């Protein structure tokens, strides 16, 4: 072939300045593009061999070599694929590849940020000009009597092509790096980028420094293969040591046997795993392989709890592994890693348009060859095929979790504390996932047993039934009352029914802090009542959703009110005088005219005072804090606390009977702070006053 000088395209402007400036933060993708081209060339050559159109040489080993040369400022990508003839270079490099790159840039030039384009596939060979001022191609086709070809381009629209000197089938691409991109000729930087994009490509990839001196290693002679280049055969004679026996005699004992070794040129080690674990059938994978793969990919040396192996061929091809790490920290600060691949080529991390958002708390890899590339994120969001992929992944995760709950409840309970934030977050974010997991949400009760929501409700019903049975022997001797009394009773019953109709939902009591709410827990347990532990910050949103989806239930924190079972059966009228007196006394002592005070006769006489806050009021306070409204008056939303005083307690009786005593204000303040302490931590200022007051009271006792 005579030398040829030509234009890449007569119908296009010079695209190279655009390529050089485009995707500045992602210049390293040229590694992926050029290595992918080499993999494709090797795959095609192997297919030709299978079809009988070409016969591979004995001992043929597909490989891609990358040679870095920081001194010469060059990078070489060498494959032993099918190679190209001059006509093919003309067609594929000068026309098709250039046209494809031009179309790609034209289509996405206004969407060049990483937030817009998925993976940045499409520049292909011409991605080399993102980092190079000049590129050479040397190629020899597999075709019989093919002539090697040499092609050069210096970053303009013109090229030169001539006969080359390559002697083995395949293609070698040489990049002459520009001054801004010399980092890519650094061996460590090159390794980093290759492992980022190409860790699982199907062809072995080898990296070396060009013209570097040979390195050697010594191996046992029996391990030498015909591929090894032996530099020297080494014989290490057996070694003996003198040993003294019990009878005092001495003898020579062999401590290391005679060994034959070979000094060989160090064997190259591929940077990638050509058979990733996700590509295997789940039945062929061991637990240790799953754990090893997890540690390797995610650099996390804490073992995952368990994993899901995705393996689907129809109606789309999708494989992958999702790992469940421990997720018992604040869910809104957790960031997992889901790596998305296309035919074992890395695309990007955490593509939420493909992978359901709640799965971002997990770690895993998903390989989907059918995933559309060269599309914007907005296009993926509206792609029905992509939605099917997302739905499938959600279904498999839900199936795994529900299946574990049904067939291995013990393991499911063991993992629950770690995985519950993920499951609850998934329920909040994905209705379909929530539908599938609704019956497999667990709640840990005060005895550390795990219950489903129906089991929680059954427990509450059992407690209520027990209390009802105890009250069946109440006095019913009212048959001879007059009609007026009957009318009064009927009216009272009607009022009660109306009140029940207002909120007939079944309560599920819960605790957010076992230590802080210990007094309330004790009161519950004394009455054989139960509550569930909801101590994660996702629980507030989660129980709101549960109430929306299950209109017959309501979640009530254990300190929202005192249940009837904790109190003696006393009418309000009997306690009215005590309530009025104590309200006036406490408001005066605490200098708080808005203080809500109530008086009850609690069965536990040791309890002097407790604080209650309605569930609605507390949730409103939580919402105010969440939205930075903490300075607003919570009473605007029914959020005032109520101080409950126990009329059966000796100290409360003392205050009631000695309201004018000089010590009563101190006792009132102390009782109020004690009630607050059992509900929530005191402020630093309030705690200081509480400690000083405690010392004062002890001093009074000492006198």
Residue ranges of model-derived segments:
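GHKL (Bergerat-fold) ATPase N-terminal catalytic module, capturing the glycine-rich phosphate-binding loop
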Residues: 1-185, 192, 199, 215-219, ...
């Amino acid at each position: 072939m005579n030398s040829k000088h030509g234009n890449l395209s007569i119908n296009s402007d010079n695209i190279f300045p655009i390529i050089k400036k485009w995707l500045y933060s992602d210049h390293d993708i040229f590694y992926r593009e050029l290595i992918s081209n080499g993999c494709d060339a090797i795959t095609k050559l192997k297919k030709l061999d299978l079809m009988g159109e070409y016969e591979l040489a004995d001992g043929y080993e597909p490989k891609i070599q990358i040679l870095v040369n920081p001194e010469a400022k060059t990078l070489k990508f060498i494959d032993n694929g099918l190679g190209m003839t001059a006509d093919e270079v003309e067609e594929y490099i000068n026309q098709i590849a250039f046209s494809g790159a031009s179309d790609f840039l034209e289509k996405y030039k206004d969407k060049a940020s990483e937030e817009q384009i998925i993976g940045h596939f499409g520049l292909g060979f011409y991605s080399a000009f993102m980092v190079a001022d000049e590129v050479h191609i040397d190629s020899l086709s597999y075709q019989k009597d093919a002539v090697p070809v040499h092609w050069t381009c210096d970053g303009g629209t013109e090229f030169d092509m001539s006969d080359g000197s390559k002697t083995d089938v395949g293609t070698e691409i040489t990049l002459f790096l520009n001054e801004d991109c010399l980092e890519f000729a650094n061996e460590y930087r090159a390794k980093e980028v290759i492992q980022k994009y190409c860790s699982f490509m199907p062809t072995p990839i080898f990296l070396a420094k060009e013209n570097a001196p040979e390195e050697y290693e010594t191996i046992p002679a029996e391990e030498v293969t015909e591929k090894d280049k032996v530099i020297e055969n080494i014989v290490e004679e057996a070694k003996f040591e003198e040993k003294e026996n019990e009878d005092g005699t001495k003898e020579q004992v062999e401590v290391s046997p005679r060994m034959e070794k070979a000094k060989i040129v160090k064997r190259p080690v591929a940077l990638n795993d050509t058979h990733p674990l996700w590509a295997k059938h789940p039945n062929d994978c061991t637990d240790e392989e799953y754990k090893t793969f997890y540690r390797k990919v995610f650099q996390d040396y804490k073992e995952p709890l368990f994993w899901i192996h995705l393996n689907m061929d129809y109606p789309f091809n999708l494989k992958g592994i999702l790992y469940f790490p421990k997720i018992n920290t604040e869910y809104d600060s957790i960031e997992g890693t889901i790596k998305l691949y296309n035919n074992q080529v890395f695309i990007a991390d955490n593509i939420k348009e493909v992978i359901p958002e709640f799965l971002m708390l997990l770690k895993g890899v998903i390989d989907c060859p059918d995933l559309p590339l060269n599309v914007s994120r907005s296009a993926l969001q509206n792609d029905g095929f992509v939605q099917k992929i997302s739905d499938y992944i959600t279904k498999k995760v839900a199936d795994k979790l529900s299946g574990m709950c049904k067939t291995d409840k013990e393991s499911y309970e063991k993992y629950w504390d770690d995985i519950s934030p993920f499951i609850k977050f998934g329920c909040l974010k994905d209705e379909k996932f929530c539908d599938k997991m609704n019956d497999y949400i667990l709640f840990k009760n005060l005895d550390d047993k795990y219950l489903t929501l129906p089991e929680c409700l059954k427990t509450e019903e059992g407690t209520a039934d027990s209390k009802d049975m105890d009250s069946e022997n109440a006095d019913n001797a009212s048959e001879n009352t007059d009609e007026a009394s009957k009318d009064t009773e009927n009216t009272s019953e009607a009022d009660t029914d109306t009140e029940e109709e207002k909120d007939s939902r079944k309560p599920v009591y819960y605790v957010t802090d076992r230590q802080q709410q210990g007094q309330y827990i004790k009161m519950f347990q004394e009455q054989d009542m139960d509550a569930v532990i909801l101590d994660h910050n996702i629980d507030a949103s989660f129980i709101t959703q549960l109430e929306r989806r299950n209109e017959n239930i309501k979640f009530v924190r254990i300190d929202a009110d005192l249940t009837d079972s904790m109190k003696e059966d006393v009418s309000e009228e009997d306690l009215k005088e005590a309530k009025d007196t104590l309200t006036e006394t406490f408001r005066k002592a605490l200098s708080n005219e808005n203080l809500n005070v109530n008086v009850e006769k609690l069965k536990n006489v040791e309890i002097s005072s407790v604080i209650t806050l309605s569930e609605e009021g507390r949730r409103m306070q939580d919402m105010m804090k969440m939205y930075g409204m903490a300075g607003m008056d919570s009473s605007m939303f029914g959020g005032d606390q109520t101080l409950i005083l126990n009329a059966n307690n000796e100290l409360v009786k003392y205050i009631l009977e000695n309201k004018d005593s000089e010590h009563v204000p101190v006792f009132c303040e102390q009782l109020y702070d004690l009630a607050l302490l059992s509900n929530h931590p005191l402020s630093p200022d309030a705690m200081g006053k509480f400690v000083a007051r405690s010392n004062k009271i002890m001093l009074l006792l000492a006198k």
